[in-house]
Curated annotation (Swiss-Prot):
Record-level GO cellular component terms: cytosol; fungal biofilm matrix
Motif placement: DEAD box: 171-174
Organism encoding this protein: Candida glabrata (strain ATCC 2001 / BCRC 20586 / JCM 3761 / NBRC 0622 / NRRL Y-65 / CBS 138) (Yeast)
Annotated keywords: ATP-binding, Cytoplasm, Helicase, Hydrolase, Initiation factor, Nucleotide-binding, Protein biosynthesis, RNA-binding
Name the record gives this protein: ATP-dependent RNA helicase eIF4A
Gene name tied to this protein: TIF1
EC number(s) recorded for this UniProt protein: 3.6.4.13
Assembly and oligomerization: Component of the eIF4F complex, which composition varies with external and internal environmental conditions. It is composed of at least eIF4A, eIF4E and eIF4G.
CDD domains for this protein: DEADc_EIF4AII_EIF4AI_DDX2, SF2_C_DEAD
Ranges where the Helicase C-terminal domain occurs: 234-395
Residue ranges of every copy of the Helicase ATP-binding domain listed in the record: 54-223
Pfam families recorded: DEAD, Helicase_C
Protein family (similarity comment): Belongs to the DEAD box helicase family. eIF4A subfamily.
């Protein structure tokens, strides 16, 4: 079947040119030790993307999968990579790239958990560690998870031998290609063996992603979630028009008095706004953490650890966090500022409803944002309703 001949699967709003669907992990012919790891991790039944994407990746096809955070995509490529590598070969065989250090570490954690019973090593090739540590880890790790800059540096320094690489996986490709990594990613492609299988995962399909597909992928299997399904199911979306910027803070504190949730993430567009909001909330006796890209790495790690453990109730962030960090307890996301980039909206609100967990997203807007809100609705074919007065019922 040609890549242009798409079969639409109505039951889950997925379009694909690959007609095999495997509904159970037991039917995927997975390595017995890997299967133990899959069930041990808590995966009982494959998600829609896993039912359709794991097998073509295992079969060695180039695969282009469009799926947002929370669909099980990390499990998809992790399971497939673990099935494809040879544990007896103590050298890198699969390279996974992610746009941020945090997401790379999250992926490493998932791969290690799934491969717990296998004799494999997973190395995180990321900033904030020494090149000596990298050289040591890269020597005998079968799977390398990293950020583009650090991976490229290590290949250039000849510390990362890519001769045995047979899989190149790009997660959140739209984000990586739009944030200055494009040149490095292209150069990494040219350094890998020409037979390398390419797996590309992206929430959206902008021109940059399609260019990579055309240049570096051979007749890819395409598994595309229809765009109007990309607004995460199970997320209730609302807006509050506070009219002017100065009224956002009072609205936030009023809201928080009215609802009882375990934890919340609040997104702002700038570091300065994050710092100001953190100071005001702290002064008003709210337990708050904040994170942004300029923070020292050790501090960022500590803050994320505290938030995951539940010792901090509110996390205020820039879009650094808007991609793929799995914080299980979050049921509320507040966009203190509407994102400047439409694509980031889905990653922000996805924080509250991963894998079918329910969540609420509340967008604060001023009068000038009304048009931008309507454009978001149009972009995602969704409805963002005015927040009702009885908001406490949203969390019951």
């Amino acid at each position: 079947m040609s890549t242009d001949q798409m079969t639409q699967l109505d039951e889950s709003q997925i379009e694909t040119n690959y007609d095999k669907v495997v509904y159970e992990f037991d039917d995927m012919n997975l390595n017995e030790k890997l299967l133990r790891g899959v069930f041990g991790y808590g995966f009982n039944k494959p998600s829609a993307i896993q039912q359709r994407a794991i097998m073509p990746i295992i079969e060695g096809n180039d695969v282009l999968a469009q799926a947002q955070s929370g669909t099980g995509k990390t499990g998809t490529f992790s399971i497939a990579a673990l099935q494809r590598i040879d544990p007896a070969i103590k050298a890198p065989q699969a390279l996974m790239l992610a746009p941020t250090r945090e997401l790379a570490l999250q992926i490493q954690k998932v791969v290690m958990a799934l491969g717990f019973h296998m004799d494999i090593k997973v190395h995180a090739c990321i900033g904030g560690t020494s090149f000596v540590e990298d050289a040591e880890g890269l020597r005998d790790a079968q799977i390398v998870v990293g950020t583009p800059g650090r991976v490229f540096d290590n290949i250039q320094r000849r510390k990362f031998k890519v001769d045995n690489i047979k899989m190149f996986i790009l997660d959140e490709a739209d984000e990586m290609l739009s944030t200055g990594f494009k040149e490095q990613i292209y150069q990494i492609f040219t350094m890998l063996p020409p037979t390398t299988q390419v797996v590309l995962l992206s929430a959206t399909m902008p021109r940059d992603v399609l260019e990579v597909t055309a240049k570096f992928m051979q007749n890819p299997v395409r598994i595309l979630v229809k765009k109007d399904e990309l607004t995460l199911e199970g997320i209730k979306q609302f807006y509050v028009n506070v009219e002017e910027e100065q009224f956002k803070y009072d609205c936030l504190t009023d809201l928080y008095d009215s609802i009882s949730v375990t934890q919340a993430v609040i997104f702002c567009n700038t570091r300065r706004k994050v710092e100001e909001l953190t100071q005001r909330l702290t002064a008003d006796n709210f337990t708050v953490s904040s994170i942004y890209s300029d923070l020292p790495q050790q501090e960022r790690d500590t803050i994320m650890k505290e938030f995951r453990s539940g010792s901090s109730r509110i996390l205020i962030s820039t879009d650094l966090l808007a991609r793929g960090i799995d914080v299980q307890q979050v049921s509320l996301v507040i966009n203190y500022d509407l994102p400047t980039n439409k694509e980031n909206y889905i990653h922000r609100i996805g924080r509250g409803g991963r894998f079918g967990r329910k969540g609420v997203a509340i967008n604060f807007i001023v009068n000038e944002d009304v048009q931008a809100l309507r454009e978001l609705e149009q972009f995602y074919s969704t409805q963002i309703e005015e927040l009702p007065s009885d908001i406490g019922t949203l969390f019951t």
